[in-house]
Amino acid sequence: TERLVKLGNNVKAFTLYNSFNSKGWLDYCDKDIMKEFEIFSGDIRDLGSVRAAAKSCDIIIHLAALIGIPYSYHAPQSYIDTNIKGTQNVLETARDFEVENVIHTSTSEVYGTARFVPITEEHPLQGQSPYAASKIGADQIAMSFYTSFEIPVSIIRPFNTYGPRQSTRAVIPTIINQITDGQSRLNLGALH
């Protein structure tokens, strides 16, 4: 969001409504930058919310998802509702509003355990957790809107990412923090 604003884009952010009026990580954005974009609170699972947020948008960068593999075993329905139904809502809205492009953010988890490396787009999809299965479902819905309705969709499947405000539970921030803390030996836990 910050980078798009700095590049001069007209940005609208869609955040999950909550009674605390928290905007999630956007609460930590530079206040001057926050003045430069619109924040719309709603729920990705609600088509009306998605339509209201996407009104007058040319491009949709779809990042909304329930993430976290462990919790998906306890609440698989929540992952299906958010990740699959939410993606369908985005795509239906994009079709109705004739959006120029939808960038759908998936995950490398859709590949499961690597059968070969490097992993390519031809690698089989393996839903090894409810989270991964829900993202596979979302990807397939996105592909179906491309083939059925010619909605321009790009699916990205990031592996390890890093950036501002990222949880230190992820591997790259863990390594970066240990290096900046001056540790001479990295502690990454069990690697076997």
Regions found by a protein language model. Name each.
Residues 72, 123, 151-164, 174-192:
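A conserved pocket-lining segment of Rossmann-fold NAD(P)-dependent short-chain dehydrogenase/reductase
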Residues 1-161:
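N-terminal Rossmann-like NAD(P)+-binding domain of SDR-like oxidoreductases, especially those catalyzing
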Residues 171:
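Conserved catalytic loops of nucleotide-sugar-dependent glycosyltransferases that act on lipid-linked
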